Amino acid sequence: IHKKIYRQQSFSNETGNFSINDNLATHTLFIVDEASMISNEGLSGAMFGTGRLLDDLIQFVYSGTGCRLLLMGDTAQLPPVGEELSPALFTDALKGYGLEVREVDLTQVVRQVQDSGILWNATRLRELIAEDECYSLPKIRISGFADIKVVPGEELIDTLTACYERDGMDETIVVCRSNKRANIYNKGIRAQILYR
């Protein structure tokens, strides 16, 4: 997104400021996947546009003649850090820009095997959220699935190393309960396993 909607305005001392680019496109549909990650939390001293990515994206797209925006993402994913909801997937927030908004939910999973424990748990959680019955963290079913393995902390580094070697990084996932915990795990994995 940043590469498309921002242009470098000035450059000094290793930092640059970027302003919203001109949208020269006409009658173009801009498609943004993983839109749940788009934040609109204002950043003081931001070097990109207004510091509010969703505001800047919408301003850029709709400044072009006849341009439209398609935002795709999973509303059940964690919202951007510091936000309660993913603003780019929240219909009322988008209507606040004066946009005509259409919302569609896709319910058929095509990228997971049907006997996946991850899929089973994600589907159950999504159903609880849709029924507005998710008042506390539900019990996650972990037994009986080939794609779920519970690993004690002292075995985590060895297990992840083995999984990366056997299955590859793209096929190995660590599930965390928060963005904060995911950042901690990511730093540890980079430092102790990937040596970055």
Residue positions per predicted region:
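Inter-Walker segment of RecA-like/P-loop motor cores
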Residues: 1-30
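Conformational gate/switch positions in structured elements
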Residues: 1-3, 7-8, 34, 75, ...
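Conserved helicase NTPase motor core
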Residues: 23-32, 38-40, 57-58
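Loop/turn-to-beta-strand initiation segments
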Residues: 26-29, 64-71
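Short loop/turn segments at strand-loop or loop-helix junctions that form parts
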Residues: 30-36, 73-75, 106-108
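Conserved ATPase-coupling elements of RecA-like P-loop NTPase cores
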Residues: 35-54, 75-85
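Catalytic-core regions built around general acid/base machinery
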Residues: 53-63
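Conserved helicase motor core of P-loop NTPases
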Residues: 61-67, 76-196
